[in-house]
A protein has these predicted regions:
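Acidic, serine/threonine-rich low-complexity disordered tracts
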Residues: 19-112, 158-253
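Positively charged n-region of N-terminal signal peptides that target proteins for export
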Residues: 1-4
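Short non-domain terminal segments
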Residues: 9, 21, 86, 145-147, ...
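Active-site/ligand-binding surface loops and adjacent short beta/alpha elements
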Residues: 114-176
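Hydrophobic h-region of N-terminal signal peptides that target proteins for export
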Residues: 8-17
């Protein structure tokens, strides 16, 4: 669930470019639905914004669970990021999270030299009953295309899906405040998505997260991105131990 919320609340290939489209100032709202059998109830909301500022994009995600869902699992997340427009390179990532009874504050600052990428990571973590948490700092290193749980939302929108073949697979590294993971993205072609009396023609992609050892770190996720010039992810879906979470776009401006 945490990966899905981070993408809402979320490709190494020389033939693909993350500069196919540029982003104007925008705001996208989502509703987060919990589905299990006949149960289909809104569990939360999320809002993503991106602002042009000189050579950079300033990004932000806020997400919160609805009051009834707070009784089972509270979510109050804020993610902030800075992306360099040239090359679409993440420069800074921050996540302030209250999930369940746990509080986390992650910061990643990027450094690049040629194809090498370093992430200077700080994590502060505490439980609800702790007055002061623990702080850990470490450095993550990798090579090639690298994103985080916020910048990947915009990176996947900027790819040229029209040049991809069905079932084509792309790989890249994704940083969190704790570790790096391999993100595998598979393109499934175009599909129609309908909800709230509207329908959208979309590119369908799926995500798989694995550790350095190749072990899956979460269940697969799916996203549907409109084929028009706005490239809005109108639907995201992830499987939970019981039921699944679906996120639907409810507004764009």
């Amino acid at each position: 669930m945490k990966y899905l919320l981070s993408l809402i609340i979320g490709f190494i290939s020389l033939s693909l470019s993350a500069n196919e489209i540029s982003f104007n100032n925008e705001k996208v709202n989502y509703k987060v639905m919990y589905k299990w059998g006949l149960v289909n109830k809104q569990a939360g909301t999320a809002t993503l914004t991106i602002t042009n500022k000189g050579d950079n994009y300033i990004t932000k995600l806020t997400a919160r669970s609805d009051p009834w869902a707070d009784k089972f699992y509270t979510v109050r997340d804020t993610l902030n990021g800075i992306i360099k427009k040239a090359g679409f390179l993440p420069m800074f990532y921050e996540k302030k999270a209250h999930e369940g009874g746990e509080f986390k504050h992650d910061i990643v600052k990027y450094s690049r030299s040629g194809n090498k990428v370093l992430g200077y990571c700080t994590r502060i973590k505490r439980d609800e009953d702790e007055a002061k948490g623990t702080k850990k700092e470490h450095i993550i290193s990798t090579t090639g295309t690298t994103v985080d749980m916020l910048s990947v939302y915009y990176y996947m929108r900027a790819l040229n899906y029209d040049e991809m073949k069905k079932n084509q697979v792309m790989k890249l590294t994704i940083f969190s405040g704790k570790r790096k993971e391999l993100l595998t993205i598979k393109y499934h072609g175009t599909e129609n998505v309908a909800y709230d009396n509207k329908s959208y023609n979309c590119y369908h992609i799926s995500f798989t997260f694995t550790s350095d050892g190749g072990k899956k770190t979460s269940d697969d996720m799916d996203a549907w991105i409109t084929t028009d010039s706005k490239r809005i992810p109108v639907k995201l879906e992830g499987v939970l131990p019981v039921g699944k979470v679906q996120c639907f776009c409810t507004g764009y401006n």
